[in-house]
Amino acid sequence: VNDYELMTAALVHGRGHDFDLAALREVIEKRGYVREAGTYKITSRDMLRCEYGIVVSARDGRGMELPLNPDFPPASALSPEQAVAVKKILNSRDFITLFRGSAGTGKSFTLREVTAGIQAAGLPVVVLAPQRQQVADLCADGLTADTLAHCLLIKSLPRRAVVLVDEAGQIGGKQMDMLINLVKAHNGRLILSGDTRQHGAVQASDGLRAIEKFSGLRAAVLRDIRRQNPALARSAKERAFVTGYRKAVKAASS
C-alpha cells in the first residue's frame, strides 16, 4: 500500500483524536515498515515474508511435475487460440500453472475443456473462486465449484487434486499462501486463472501479481474477443468492455 493511503485512512479513522500528520508519520516510521525503493509503497515484514514464500513455491515448482494430460485432444469447437491454451495447460510440468483471459475470450469454455482433460487423466479437479457469485457463474457454465474461503476452512482436498482457481487476481497474499500450502500437503497441483490488470486483491497483498512478476512462470493467454455482441454479455461490466472494444477496433480501422 502507498504510505499516503495508510495515512489518509488513519486520519479519517482518528477524526476527533489529538494527533496530527507529523505525529502520524513518526508512528509509521517506528513501525518498521519495509519501503520499496523509489516509490511510496510500504509493507509489513510479515507480508513480505508471505509474498516471498508464495514466489518461492511458484519458482521452485517449475518443471518439477509430470504433464497433466499431454495426449488429450481439445474439442473441435474450441478456437485455435483456445486449443493452444488448453494444450499448454495440460502439458504444464509446473506446480503452479497460470492462465489469463479477458472478458469475452471464452475463458470459461476453455476452463471446462481443461477440466475435462485433467479428469480424463484420472486426476480429481477442485474448482474454486473467491466470491459466491463467481462460484454461481462457474456452476452455470457447467463446472462444479466452491468458494476459496470454504475450502480453506475445511482444509481438505482429494489426494493429487488439481485445484483450479478462477478470478485468482482477487486473492490476497495470506489466502494464497494458505492455499499453496494446502495443495502441497495433498500432493496436488494449482492452476490460477485471472487477470491482474482487471481485478486486484481485496485483502492485503496481491498473491497472483507477485507470482506473475517474480516467479518466471509464463501464462497460457487468451486475447481474441469471442463474444463481440454486447447484447450477449453476461454482466453490465462485460457489456461495457465489449462495447468499448468494438469502438476501439472501429476507430483503429477508420
Model-derived regions: residue spans:
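Conserved ATP-binding/catalytic motifs of P-loop helicase motor domains
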Residues: 1-254
